[in-house]
Design a protein with these regions (language model features):
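Short, surface-exposed, charged amphipathic helix/loop patches that serve as local interaction elements
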Residues: 2-84
Length: 84
């Protein structure tokens, strides 16, 4: 299962404009590797990077409002349980 999210604020990364992201469900081991003790924001960034198959550096370029929407949408869709 995958989910597509259209960004309100597209961004540039490695010379291309990114206006929509696609996320896949995570495997248990991926969630474990993404979890950063005591740092929920870093965990959320890593989860987004793994599930979108983009580097962390790309995820860090996402507008904060879009990132909040992404976190909410992935949580509501059951892609991961309270890693953010």
């Amino acid at each position: 299962m995958k989910i597509k999210i259209k960004l309100k604020y597209p961004f540039q990364f490695e010379g291309r404009e990114i206006s929509e992201l696609e996320f896949r469900r995570l495997k248990t081991g991926e969630v474990r590797r993404a979890t950063h003790k005591g740092d929920e924001m870093q965990t959320a960034i890593t989860v987004a990077a793994i599930s979108s198959e983009l580097p962390v550096e790309a995820i860090e370029e996402i507008d904060a409002a879009d990132f909040h929407e992404i976190s909410e949408a992935l949580g509501e869709a059951g892609f991961f349980s309270h890693t953010t």
